């Protein structure tokens, strides 16, 4: 029996197989061979297509199973780590409505800083453990204010790892 680990990063998706009983690493691969592209339409913006993550996740899983000669039916659990604070918004069919605004995008920092001022330092530190300057919620509010036609169609919003799961 085996564990499958996935790491959905902004440069690649990694897949690793570990033997469940011994903890021995069997094989680790990453897709694509070169880095995934990041779209930057303006300064301080950074976006990626969630469907590209999905494509490379599927490719990496198939590769790690094939190259290790492990039957996928012997995988007993899957763990996912991923880039934080990325905003993925989908419609009722689970299709992304726009590219994901990822962790290194700074367009919504002022929105987060305004929230910090309104909420106050005590509340932010006790509930958020940080200033919400670049948090996903700030990015969601940016979409609401700047792309209302997209915001109206949102069925669910999530982080990159949730989209993959």
Q: Positions of the model-derived regions?
A:
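N-terminal glycine/serine-rich phosphate-binding loop of ATP-dependent small-molecule kinases
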Residues: 1-98, 110, 126, 153
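Gly/Ser/Thr-rich active-site cleft segment
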Residues: 2, 8-10, 123-165
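Residue-level signal for well-ordered alpha-helical scaffold segments within enzymatic catalytic domains
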Residues: 59, 63, 114, 142-145
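Short, flexible helix/strand-to-coil boundary loops that buttress conserved ligand/catalytic motifs
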Residues: 91, 116, 147
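Carbohydrate-associated surface elements
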Residues: 105
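Hinge/lid segment of periplasmic solute-binding proteins
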Residues: 109-120
């Amino acid at each position: 029996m085996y564990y499958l680990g996935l790491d959905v990063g902004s440069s690649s998706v990694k897949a690793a197989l570990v033997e469940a009983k011994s903890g021995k690493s069997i094989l680790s691969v990453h897709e694509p061979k070169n880095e995934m592209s990041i779209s930057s339409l303006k300064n301080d913006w950074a976006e990626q297509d969630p469907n590209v993550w999905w494509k490379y996740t599927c490719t990496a899983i198939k590769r790690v199973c094939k190259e290790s000669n492990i039957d996928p039916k012997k995988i007993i659990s899957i763990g996912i780590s991923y880039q934080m604070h990325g905003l993925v918004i989908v419609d009722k069919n689970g299709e992304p409505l726009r590219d994901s605004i990822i962790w290194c995008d700074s367009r919504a920092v002022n929105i987060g800083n305004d929230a910090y001022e309104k909420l106050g330092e005590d509340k932010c530190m006790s509930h958020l453990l940080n200033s919400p300057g670049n948090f996903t919620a700030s990015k969601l509010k940016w979409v609401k204010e700047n792309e209302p036609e997209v915001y109206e169609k949102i069925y669910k919003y999530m982080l990159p790892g949730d989209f993959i799961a």
